[in-house]
Amino acid sequence: MREQGFIPKDCHFKVSAHTGHGNPCSAKLMESLGANSFNPVRDIQLQMLAAIRAAIDIPIDLHTENPKSSGGFIRHYEVPEFIRICAPVYLKTGGSVAATHSWDTTEADARKRAKQVALVKRVIDEYYPEAIVSPKY
């Protein structure tokens, strides 16, 4: 549909972790259907992330943490490996502050989310300082 002009070329489609995809085959299928980035299920192991990266060329979106309602886990110390294995990768940070998904964020919550971002950046700076930030689009 992009090639035919029905969808603008600069319209990006991001496959959400809520769709439940978590293997190389489904990642490749989503890419072939026009996905611009792929967000696998949140608790996926590093080995599976490496297999997904080998299967697709589009960026991978990864949650560094989650709200309590969807596991409540924090993976900050895995972030350097996320980058090494999955680049290009977009990190989704700050979710552990929320009680649930689609939760209204207060000013205090925004400050807590910013703190989570700073913590992830500190882990990257400490354990993978040679990581390169992607250009902004």
Residue map of PLM features:
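Generic hydrophobic/aromatic pocket-lining and core-packing "Φ" positions
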Residues: P24-A27, L49
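Short beta->alpha connector loops at strand-helix junctions that form conserved
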Residues: P40-R42
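Active-site pocket-lining/capping segments in soluble small-molecule metabolic enzymes
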Residues: M1-H18, L46-Y137
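Conserved, mostly hydrophobic/aromatic
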Residues: M30
